[in-house]
């Protein structure tokens, strides 16, 4: 999970493995969340993180922070780190090109969504062009109105199925 990436040693090992797999011709897709980073930013802003049933309650203000942290800071830093280490990474957000579409999971969680549709084409295009796609887990609402916070493990599994991944 994402919390494991807090460890510098583990993060460096994972990044090295991703680059090695890519260099030997294995298509690798990195799907990430960023719970600890979101919590840290909310704390800086004086906003308390609240969880129900293990899910972050995501009101509109929190969703703005989630989107900024996941699609901005975490995504771009991870892609940049892969590139610095010799990979060819490109950062994508689930909002890009209709990659992830979601519907409200349950009103008690706020803007937390469940995936309704995954379009693997943007990721497949990056893989075909020789890039390591780095995907953050914010989804466009099927209503076209809201963005939703999506569980990264669920998003990774659904994207893997949509891509026909072997592992």
Residue ranges and their predicted role:
Residues 1-167:
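Nucleotide/pyrophosphate-binding catalytic subdomain
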